[in-house]
Amino acid sequence: VLTRRLERALICADNARVVNVSSKVHSIVKKLDFASLRKPTKSLSGINEYAVSKLANILFTSELHRRYASLGISSFAIHPGLVDTEIWRTLPFFLRPILKLKGMLTPEEGAKNVLQCAFVDASTYSGKYFSKCTPSSPSTLATDQELAIKLWEQSESWMNHYSE
């Protein structure tokens, strides 16, 4: 929504960039069910919903690139790494040490990974997915161009519906 609201400013700017924060967890999504996106969740952990949102960020990045690269807008999706933030606050206490062993990043280190996309070569990497500062391959579902178009169009429809 924010990117679409800033569309005119992005088009007018020199070398505009949109960086969407994603996550490797997007890869657990096997199918994107648009009907379920409008229903209240029954999930207790929220992990599936989080994964879907991160998949959507990658698909949006790809479609933004396809639609706007010729107008000078670059787009990137990045998994910053496993960052030690409040997102883990609902994780059972006994599991937290396991995450620490996996090498959690400080928020500053995670932000550094995100900021890197502000400086990479846009002509080479726009529309791409990064994992911890490195261009990476997202899941097969995240590279489905038809799904990216469908998500874009559905999102436009929902935004129009709710902004009336």
Give short role names for the model-derived ranges.
Residues 53, 77, 99-138, 143-147:
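C-terminal helical subdomain
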Residues 1-6, 10, 60-61, 117:
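Hydrophobic positions on the long internal alpha-helix
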Residues 27-31, 141, 146-164:
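Non-catalytic terminal and boundary segments that flank Rossmann-like NAD(P)-dependent oxidoreductase
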Residues 68-72, 124, 160-164:
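Surface-exposed helix-capping loop/turn segments at secondary-structure junctions
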Residues 11-99:
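Catalytic loop of short-chain dehydrogenase/reductase
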